């Protein structure tokens, strides 16, 4: 049984959704003066929106809500606030890649309004998971009905690193297993996260393992094998 279903998102998906989102904002006749990207997932969508709508002012703030892929923090919080500026009287669009629980966008919106109560703030996202989100963004490109973990093209190595670590730790707790072949890892990734994860180019698995080795999480014993 798949523990966490995943869905691979392509660059073409991102470009299409960003274009759709920009079109909805333009049609609403509410044009932002400035875009605030929620780091880190909102960076690329926000930049694409600026390009589509001819907006020059783009800043960011970082909200921590998913410290590890597909594992939510107990409470979302602002890690790095918006830089010092005056947003009062401005139309501010807060952008993220996806609204799943809604916590990240809500805390970002409340943060901006608490500092600049006279700002006209709206929110936008490429995707909105309507069945689980506690908050509906003002603008979205694509409504998702069934929850899955979306693997964005800017997050593939990080997701794989987190998934591999989780698998190795849980399997160690259950059976004491510490040595893994690449084939075993691939099979376990498919078992835990579904066959969709096999669409990720195999080169990213190598990058993920290299990062984990640099961070002291795994040790490569020989070609094709790793140790926790």
Predicted ranges, named:
Residues 1-228:
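PRPP-associated nucleotide enzymes
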């Amino acid at each position: 049984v798949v523990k966490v279903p995943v869905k691979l998102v392509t660059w073409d998906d991102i470009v299409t959704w960003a274009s759709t989102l920009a079109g909805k904002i333009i049609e609403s006749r509410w044009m932002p003066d400035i875009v605030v990207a929620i780091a880190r997932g909102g960076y690329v969508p926000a930049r694409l929106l600026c390009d589509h709508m001819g907006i020059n002012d783009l800043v960011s703030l970082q909200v921590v809500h998913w410290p590890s892929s597909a594992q939510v923090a107990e409470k979302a919080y602002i890690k790095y606030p918006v830089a010092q500026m005056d947003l009062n009287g401005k139309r501010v669009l807060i952008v993220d890649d996806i609204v799943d629980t809604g916590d990240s966008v809500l805390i970002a919106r409340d943060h901006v309004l608490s500092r600049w109560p006279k700002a006209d703030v709206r929110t936008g996202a490429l995707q909105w998971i309507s069945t689980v989100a506690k908050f509906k963004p003002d603008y979205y490109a694509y409504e998702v009905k069934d929850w899955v973990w979306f693997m964005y093209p800017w997050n593939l190595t990080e997701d794989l690193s987190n998934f591999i670590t989780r698998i190795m730790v849980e399997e160690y707790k259950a059976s004491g297993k510490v040595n893994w072949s690449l084939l075993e890892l691939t099979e376990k990734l498919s078992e835990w996260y579904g066959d969709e994860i096999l669409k990720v180019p195999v080169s990213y698995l190598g990058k993920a393992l290299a990062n984990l080795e640099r961070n002291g999480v795994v040790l490569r014993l020989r070609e094709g094998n790793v140790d926790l």
